[in-house]
C-alpha cells in the first residue's frame, strides 16, 4: 500500500475466543464475513502501533465473527490486541455496482438542492434499517434519506457534488 493511499476502517478486535489465539471481531462490512475478502489488513492498536497482516482467516461462530491471525497462537497476545482497528486500502475494495456507493466515498462531498441552494458537506452516513441517511453539515445539520432517485438526484465525484430534491428549510 502506498503511504498516501486512503484507508477504510472495516472493523475492530473486541476480544479473545478460546485459548489458541483466535480473536472476536466487530465487522462493518456487509455481510459481516466479507471483511476476510479484503486484504492485506492494516491493524492499528489503541496506542497507535501499526502492522500489516495478510492471510487472515475467519468464520462466523454464532453471534461472533472469529479470526485467526498468522503467527498468533496464544490468548495473552490476543487480549493485548483488544480495541485494535482493522483497515484496508481503498483499492482493496471492489468497484461499487451502478447506483451503489461506499459511504466513505460520499463523505466530504458538497450537497446542494436541485434549485442550486448549497446545503453543506457530507459529514457521515448512518443506517436506519429501512434506508441510509446522509448527514449534511452547513449553516446547520440536516439529515437527508439517501434514497435514489426520490431524494438523491445525482452523485458526481468529478464535481465533488451530490444534488438532492430537498427543502432547504427542512
Curated annotation (Swiss-Prot):
Gene3D superfamilies: PRC-barrel domain (2.30.30.240), RimM (2.40.30.60). InterPro entries: PRC_barrel-like_sf (IPR011033), PRC_RimM (IPR056792), RimM (IPR011961), RimM_N (IPR002676), RimM_N_sf (IPR036976), Transl_B-barrel_sf (IPR009000). One of its GO terms (molecular function) is ribosome binding. It is found in: Cytoplasm. GO terms for biological process: ribosomal small subunit biogenesis; rRNA processing. Pfam families: PRC_RimM, RimM. Residues 98-170 form the PRC barrel domain. One of its GO terms (cellular component) is cytoplasm. Keywords: Chaperone, Cytoplasm, Ribosome biogenesis, rRNA processing. Belongs to the RimM family. An accessory protein needed during the final step in the assembly of 30S ribosomal subunit, possibly for assembly of the head region. Essential for efficient processing of 16S rRNA. May be needed both before and after RbfA during the maturation of 16S rRNA. It has affinity for free ribosomal 30S subunits but not for 70S ribosomes. Binds ribosomal protein uS19. HAMAP family: Ribosome_mat_RimM (MF_00014). The PRC barrel domain binds ribosomal protein uS19. This is Ribosome maturation factor RimM. It comes from Xanthomonas campestris pv. campestris (strain 8004). The lineage of its organism: Bacteria, Pseudomonadati, Pseudomonadota, Gammaproteobacteria, Lysobacterales. The gene is rimM.
